[in-house]
Every structure is written in C-alpha cells, then in structure tokens.
Amino acid sequence: MDDTVKNTTDPVFLHDTFLAWCDKQPVPVIEGFGMDLSKIKAEPWDLYGMNGAICLLKGRDDFNSIFCFELPPGSKSRDIHHLYEEIVYVIDGYGSTQIETPDGDKHSFEWGRNSLFSVPLNAKYQHFNGSGTEPARLATVHNFPFLINMFRNEDFIFNTDRDFSERLGPNGYFQGEGQMIEIRPGRHQ
C-alpha cells in the first residue's frame, strides 16, 4: 500500500495573482516608465462604480500600483471597502467623500484639485463628484498587489468585515481640524 501524500493542487510558482486579476478587469491596463494620468482613457468599472484604468509603473515590483478613476459629472461611486491601504490624489475636479466608521458614524469631507487623502483601512466609503458639468479624476496609490499576491483571494480583500477602529484616530480628523503645512522650497521627503 502506498502511503505517499499526493498534492491535489498545482503548485503556484512564479504566478502573479495581481496581474492575473488585472487581466480579468474590464478597464485599460497601461504599463510604462511614466504616464500622464490626466489623459488616460478610463472605462466603466463596476467593481468601484466609476470609470477607471489600471496603471502599472515599470520597476514597481509587486508592492504597489496606481488606479486612475474618473467620476462623470454629478455621479458617485459604489459603496466600497477593502483591506488594502490607499492614498487618493485629486488630479482634477471637486467633490466629496463619505466615510462610514465601524460604529456606524458617517463623516464626509470635500476635496478639490491637488487634494491628498486616505480613507481608514477597510472603512466603507463613497466618492461624489460635486460638479454637474465636469468629470472628477482621482489617482490612487495602493498596496493591493502585495495583498492579493499574499492571500490570493479577492473575496477576502473586498468582503471582509473586520473593523480597524484602533486606526481611526480622534473624531477631529474628520472635522477639518488639521494643520496646514506650507510648501517650502527645496527637496523634502
């Protein structure tokens, strides 16, 4: 009798789950050393409820990437939540974002061109275009590639209800209590 344990699944070596996920998305995937995010063609993306494109910078490794989103005039995104960290930069337009914290409180804030913000990890949020005549364009830098390659489970990343309330900070963060940091000439990081 053979007591050898047989592997019933194929090994997953040199497989990039993120790139395979990108291939299944109905939006353009653009790769290059640089790209003008204000001119990229964005197509409808039901997952987010807005138009979008996936932007892959050469040399990015498997840690992060960019999604470019466009909200048509007067539109809004779907309610979204996910386990990846994301920083949002507003390329053009103005609008608002509503965040629902784990305790059910809703906070909203406005944004405009050159705004930069981040939504708390796995909090539900929705973007709104504040213009009835002009689109709003957002670029997000995120660590989704790292997480999807680690867990290999899209459902886990987009449908986990775990709250991270310890990462929310004080309520003042949602009420405009902040400190304006003036731009200083020179190179700073």
What are these regions (language model features)?
Residues 60, 101-122:
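Short acidic-glycine-tyrosine-enriched beta hairpin
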